[in-house]
Protein backbone atom coordinates (compact mmCIF):
# COMPACT_ATOMS: atom_id res chain seq x y z
CA UNK A 1 0.00 0.00 0.00
CA UNK A 2 1.31 3.44 -0.93
CA UNK A 3 1.08 5.58 2.19
CA UNK A 4 2.63 8.68 0.60
CA UNK A 5 -0.37 10.51 -0.79
CA UNK A 6 1.24 13.71 -1.98
CA UNK A 7 3.68 14.51 -4.73
CA UNK A 8 7.34 15.43 -4.43
CA UNK A 9 6.32 18.91 -5.51
CA UNK A 10 3.73 19.00 -2.70
CA UNK A 11 6.40 18.16 -0.13
CA UNK A 12 8.75 20.82 -1.48
CA UNK A 13 5.87 23.31 -1.47
CA UNK A 14 5.37 22.52 2.24
CA UNK A 15 9.05 23.23 2.88
CA UNK A 16 8.75 26.49 0.93
CA UNK A 17 5.71 27.47 3.00
CA UNK A 18 7.69 26.85 6.21
CA UNK A 19 10.48 29.14 5.03
CA UNK A 20 8.08 31.80 3.70
CA UNK A 21 6.20 31.85 7.01
CA UNK A 22 9.53 32.05 8.84
CA UNK A 23 10.61 34.99 6.67
CA UNK A 24 7.34 36.81 7.29
CA UNK A 25 7.49 36.11 11.02
CA UNK A 26 11.09 37.29 11.39
CA UNK A 27 10.39 40.43 9.34
CA UNK A 28 7.22 41.37 11.22
CA UNK A 29 8.50 40.46 14.69
CA UNK A 30 11.84 42.16 14.02
CA UNK A 31 10.12 45.36 12.95
CA UNK A 32 8.03 45.32 16.13
CA UNK A 33 10.95 44.58 18.45
CA UNK A 34 12.34 47.23 20.78
CA UNK A 35 15.48 45.22 21.45
CA UNK A 36 18.38 45.83 19.06
CA UNK A 37 19.69 42.31 19.73
CA UNK A 38 16.37 40.68 18.85
CA UNK A 39 15.90 42.91 15.81
CA UNK A 40 19.41 42.12 14.50
CA UNK A 41 18.98 38.37 15.04
CA UNK A 42 15.58 38.37 13.35
CA UNK A 43 17.04 40.32 10.39
CA UNK A 44 19.79 37.69 10.08
CA UNK A 45 17.28 34.83 10.35
CA UNK A 46 15.02 36.48 7.76
CA UNK A 47 17.97 36.63 5.36
CA UNK A 48 18.65 32.95 6.05
CA UNK A 49 15.02 32.10 5.28
CA UNK A 50 15.37 33.86 1.90
CA UNK A 51 18.37 31.70 1.13
CA UNK A 52 16.51 28.56 2.19
CA UNK A 53 13.60 29.50 -0.09
CA UNK A 54 16.05 29.66 -2.98
CA UNK A 55 17.46 26.22 -2.04
CA UNK A 56 14.01 24.64 -1.97
CA UNK A 57 13.05 26.30 -5.25
CA UNK A 58 16.12 24.67 -6.81
CA UNK A 59 15.28 21.29 -5.28
CA UNK A 60 11.68 21.67 -6.48
CA UNK A 61 12.70 21.98 -10.12
CA UNK A 62 13.51 18.27 -10.10
CA UNK A 63 10.09 17.15 -8.90
CA UNK A 64 6.98 16.78 -10.97
CA UNK A 65 3.45 16.79 -9.64
CA UNK A 66 3.30 13.01 -9.70
CA UNK A 67 3.33 11.15 -6.41
CA UNK A 68 6.65 10.03 -5.03
CA UNK A 69 7.15 6.29 -5.35
CA UNK A 70 5.85 4.19 -2.49
CA UNK A 71 8.04 1.86 -0.55
CA UNK A 72 7.71 -1.30 1.45
CA UNK A 73 10.13 0.06 4.07
CA UNK A 74 7.97 0.65 7.17
CA UNK A 75 10.38 3.31 8.43
CA UNK A 76 9.91 5.39 5.27
CA UNK A 77 6.17 4.73 5.30
CA UNK A 78 6.06 6.04 8.87
CA UNK A 79 7.97 9.14 7.74
CA UNK A 80 5.44 9.67 4.98
CA UNK A 81 2.56 9.50 7.46
CA UNK A 82 4.39 11.91 9.77
CA UNK A 83 4.96 14.35 6.89
CA UNK A 84 1.28 14.14 6.10
CA UNK A 85 0.37 14.93 9.71
CA UNK A 86 2.78 17.86 9.75
CA UNK A 87 1.33 19.06 6.47
CA UNK A 88 -2.00 19.55 8.21
CA UNK A 89 -0.42 21.99 10.69
CA UNK A 90 -1.35 25.61 10.00
CA UNK A 91 2.31 26.71 9.91
CA UNK A 92 2.81 24.39 6.95
CA UNK A 93 -0.41 25.15 5.07
CA UNK A 94 -1.49 28.73 5.73
CA UNK A 95 0.30 31.33 3.59
CA UNK A 96 -0.01 34.19 6.11
CA UNK A 97 0.58 32.19 9.28
CA UNK A 98 3.97 33.84 9.88
CA UNK A 99 2.36 37.27 9.92
CA UNK A 100 -0.45 36.09 12.20
CA UNK A 101 2.08 34.61 14.61
CA UNK A 102 4.12 37.82 14.62
CA UNK A 103 1.03 39.94 15.29
CA UNK A 104 0.07 37.71 18.22
CA UNK A 105 3.36 38.00 20.10
CA UNK A 106 3.27 40.14 23.23
CA UNK A 107 6.95 40.88 23.73
CA UNK A 108 10.48 39.87 22.74
CA UNK A 109 10.46 36.81 24.98
CA UNK A 110 7.23 35.63 23.40
CA UNK A 111 8.67 36.27 19.92
CA UNK A 112 11.74 34.23 20.79
CA UNK A 113 9.57 31.36 22.10
CA UNK A 114 7.58 31.33 18.86
CA UNK A 115 10.76 31.49 16.77
CA UNK A 116 12.30 28.60 18.75
CA UNK A 117 9.17 26.54 18.23
CA UNK A 118 9.17 27.29 14.49
CA UNK A 119 12.83 26.28 14.16
CA UNK A 120 12.20 23.02 16.05
CA UNK A 121 9.22 22.24 13.82
CA UNK A 122 11.33 22.95 10.74
CA UNK A 123 14.10 20.64 11.92
CA UNK A 124 11.62 17.82 12.56
CA UNK A 125 10.00 18.32 9.17
CA UNK A 126 13.32 18.39 7.31
CA UNK A 127 14.56 15.24 9.06
CA UNK A 128 11.45 13.43 7.87
CA UNK A 129 11.69 15.01 4.44
CA UNK A 130 15.23 13.65 4.10
CA UNK A 131 13.81 10.13 4.21
CA UNK A 132 11.61 10.58 1.14
CA UNK A 133 13.55 12.86 -1.22
CA UNK A 134 15.95 11.84 -3.97
CA UNK A 135 19.46 10.92 -2.86
CA UNK A 136 20.98 14.01 -4.50
CA UNK A 137 18.71 16.26 -2.41
CA UNK A 138 19.56 14.65 0.94
CA UNK A 139 22.87 16.52 1.27
CA UNK A 140 21.17 19.89 0.70
CA UNK A 141 18.57 19.04 3.33
CA UNK A 142 21.36 17.99 5.69
CA UNK A 143 22.93 21.41 5.28
CA UNK A 144 19.59 23.13 5.88
CA UNK A 145 19.05 21.04 9.02
CA UNK A 146 22.48 22.06 10.30
CA UNK A 147 21.63 25.72 9.64
CA UNK A 148 18.27 25.41 11.38
CA UNK A 149 20.05 23.89 14.40
CA UNK A 150 22.41 26.88 14.47
CA UNK A 151 19.40 29.20 14.31
CA UNK A 152 17.84 27.33 17.22
CA UNK A 153 21.06 27.67 19.23
CA UNK A 154 21.28 31.42 18.51
CA UNK A 155 17.66 31.97 19.48
CA UNK A 156 18.05 29.97 22.69
CA UNK A 157 21.26 31.78 23.56
CA UNK A 158 19.60 35.17 23.06
CA UNK A 159 16.55 34.10 25.04
CA UNK A 160 18.80 33.02 27.93
CA UNK A 161 20.80 36.26 27.72
CA UNK A 162 17.68 38.42 27.76
CA UNK A 163 16.18 36.49 30.67
CA UNK A 164 19.40 37.02 32.69
CA UNK A 165 19.74 40.70 31.87
CA UNK A 166 16.03 41.48 32.03
CA UNK A 167 16.20 43.37 28.72
Language model features with spans:
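Non-heme di-metal
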Residues: 1-167
Amino acid sequence: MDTLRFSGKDVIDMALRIEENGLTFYTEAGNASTSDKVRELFQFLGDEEKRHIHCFENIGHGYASDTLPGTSDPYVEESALYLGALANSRVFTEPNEGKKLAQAVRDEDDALRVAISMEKDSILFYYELQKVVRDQDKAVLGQLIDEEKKHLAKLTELQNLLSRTGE
